[in-house]
C-alpha cells in the first residue's frame, strides 16, 4: 500500500456508543477523499470491518473488555481483532478500542485505581514524535476512562499522563492505540455530558467545569487531531 491509488479509500469505524463517533476525524477523512462506514458493535456483523485491508478504527464505550458474560459480542469482536492484528493490518483504537487492542495482544486490561475524566496534557516519548508530535506544546486531550491496561509485549509506549502511565502505544507501523480521545469536538461535547450523566454524578465530577474545559481546549485539539491522523495515514501507506 505505497501509493494513493492502492490504499483503500473506505474507513471502517466500529462504535460501541452512538454519540462516540469519529468526531473531527470524520471531517479529516472526507477532506482527504475517504468514505466512512460505521458498524455498531453488538448489532452489526463486524466481519467486514475487521477483514478488509484499509484502516479500521475501534472507538470508545462504557463497557469493559472483560465483561464478556454480560456482553457476549465482545468475544467475537476480540477474536476478529486478534486475526486482524496478527495480519498487521492498519488499526487505530481509541479508549475502549485501545483497551481491546491491548487485550487482543495478550496484555491485562483491568479497572484502574481512579477514573480519569477531564482535559489534560500528555507526556510524550521520543518515539511519539513520528505521529503524536502535534500533541506537544501543552495541547490538552480528553481523558474519559476508568479502566487501564498493561503494555503489550513488543509494544512501544508513546504517551503517559499524571494519573496513568500507559496512555498510548504502537506495535510496528500499522497499529496505534490511544487511551485518550482526540476525536471529540466542541460542538458534540454536550452529548457526552448527557450520555454519561450517571457516571459523572457517581464520580462527583463537575459538569460545568468540563464544559469550561471544553471551550478552552477543544479547538486546539481538533487542529492537532487533524495533523495526527494525517501523520498516521502517511505512515500506514496513504500518500495523498
Task: Show where each model-derived region lies.
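Flexible gly/pro-rich beta->alpha loop and the following alpha-helix that scaffold active-site loops
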Residues: 27-92
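Accessory recognition modules or surfaces
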Residues: 3-9, 16-21, 47-55
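Short glycine-/acidic-enriched loop or helix-start segments at secondary-structure transitions
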Residues: 22-24, 67-69, 102-104, 153, ...
